[in-house]
């Protein structure tokens, strides 16, 4: 779910950047999304959005699904998840969290005018 996803982001980036910095970034980080991603981090958000869409097509509720995960030295991972929906959503979130951690953060792409830049 979205609360767990925020913890996974913090785990993957080892607390270097607060989760709120990802909530209004580029064209896809935050609610909704359209146009062409502005950079690598925004592409991570689009991939995560697409993964959640795929989960919904499978009958899952990704924004509300609670799953079991662990934050280790090397970052987050999903733990012993037997239910397919929960596993799918956890995998979406873990992959996105690692993608966020690897991608450069460009302050100029935070809180952009999406009407102009995300066509």
Swiss-Prot record:
Q: Which GO terms describe its cellular component?
A: extracellular region
Source species, domain of life = Eukaryota
Q: Which PROSITE patterns match?
A: PA2_ASP, PA2_HIS
Question: EC number(s) on record?
Answer: 3.1.1.4
- Keyword set for this entry? Calcium, Disulfide bond, Hydrolase, Lipid degradation, Lipid metabolism, Metal-binding, Neurotoxin, Presynaptic neurotoxin, Secreted, Toxin
Annotated binding of Ca(2+), by residue: 28, 30, 32, 49
Q: Tell me the GO BP annotations in alphabetical order.
A: arachidonate secretion; lipid catabolic process; phospholipid metabolic process
Disulfide bond positions = 11-71, 27-118, 29-45, 44-99, 51-92, 60-85, 78-90
Catalyzed reactions? a 1,2-diacyl-sn-glycero-3-phosphocholine + H2O = a 1-acyl-sn-glycero-3-phosphocholine + a fatty acid + H(+)
- Organism encoding this protein: Notechis scutatus scutatus (Mainland tiger snake)
| Family, per entry | Belongs to the phospholipase A2 family. Group I subfamily. D49 sub-subfamily.
Protein localization: Secreted
This one is known as Basic phospholipase A2 notechis II-5
How is expression of this protein distributed across tissues?
Expressed by the venom gland.
Co-factor remark: Binds 1 Ca(2+) ion.
Q: Which cofactor does it need?
A: Ca(2+)
- In the record, what terms sit under GO molecular function? calcium ion binding; calcium-dependent phospholipase A2 activity; phospholipid binding; toxin activity
Describe the task this protein carries out: Snake venom phospholipase A2 (PLA2) that inhibits neuromuscular transmission by blocking acetylcholine release from the nerve termini. Notechis II-5 is less toxic than notexin but has a higher specific phospholipase activity. PLA2 catalyzes the calcium-dependent hydrolysis of the 2-acyl groups in 3-sn-phosphoglycerides.
Q: What does UniProt list as catalytic?
A: 48, 93
């Amino acid at each position: 779910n979205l609360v767990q996803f925020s913890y996974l982001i913090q785990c993957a980036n080892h607390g270097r950047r607060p989760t709120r910095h990802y909530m209004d970034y580029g064209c896809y980080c935050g609610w909704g999304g359209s146009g062409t991603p502005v950079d690598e981090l925004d592409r991570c958000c689009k991939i995560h959005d697409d993964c959640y869409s795929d989960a919904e097509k499978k009958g899952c509720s990704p924004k509300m699904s609670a799953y079991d995960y662990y934050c280790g030295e090397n970052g987050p991972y999903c733990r012993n998840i037997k239910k397919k929906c929960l596993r799918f959503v956890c995998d979406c979130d873990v992959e996105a969290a690692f993608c966020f951690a690897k991608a450069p953060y460009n302050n100029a792409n935070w809180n952009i005018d999406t009407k102009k830049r995300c066509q």
